[in-house]
């Protein structure tokens, strides 16, 4: 019991402190100061200046709306003379953070539900009714086979199908693009951002932008970098691609808006930065199913009341608006945490110098003797004194 009390008393009433040994050595002294300077440079330069370790940060919350403008004219044997405006080529009218502009199409007009020959391919070409299976259908069929082999043209016969007739023939994509004039259409992007932690909000239509300016400006990275109206051709070209080539089979473009705001400075300096890149893979060596397309139909009835439709396979460019960024503002908590971390890192210099002095230098045993006071020797000294 007495032994336990003695140990407890030693724990409670004794204080241990490190022993400081001053070593006069140019090599060790210079190395110690060099390591300390490197650590200070890292803490001040990287942590506080570059990474702004004295700030609390927050991620952006964003909403985006878009509006396209532009008119095109086409004159074809199938559709005749036609004017195309926003209601014709923006499909659908509204999407979340994106916009689709139709640039090319394959149109099949006046389709009705009836029977007609299938488009020729390796599964539909036939010589007689025996080559056609009634009721058969697969994922590439235009309809359900009737079991009859009928002429597709003067030289080819195909299996007849019950479908929307005449069936769509999408073997060849029109080149150049049907709406090649879309290169000069414009896109207005309205972006509102909010940093909830700091209750800070802003939009990309800056306070100094007037109505008259907004009607005339077009984004240019050098001369007009904050105009929110973009020419479609410029978006694609700035991403390193040709609009006319992309318009043929379609694709996906990303409009990136970066908001990095230092809220310790004036709010007017929190500005959007725009960049563009193509998001769909364009690999010429592995060019299977390229581009972007989908189908839609417009239904109506003829004079006799029979239902008809016009089927459109639309090729075009989908513009995805991607908003990202962060804001920072001074806060005492991250500041103190990083200051404490920096002070703790300074201890690395001492540890490194101790390793070199005690294990690498020629006088390592001499320095060890000065650095450490061994407990065994001390106890033996006390015993000797008591025996005397």
Swiss-Prot record:
Changing residue 372 to A: Complete loss of receptor functionality. Disulfide bonds join 116-165, 126-149, 132-159, 217-227, 261-270. Glycans are attached at residues 75, 110, 153, 184, 199, 208. ATP binds at residues 67, 69, 186, 188, 293, 295, 313. The chain crosses the membrane at residues 34-54, 339-359. Belongs to the P2X receptor family. This is P2X purinoceptor 4. It comes from Rattus norvegicus. The lineage of its organism: Eukaryota, Metazoa, Chordata, Craniata, Vertebrata.
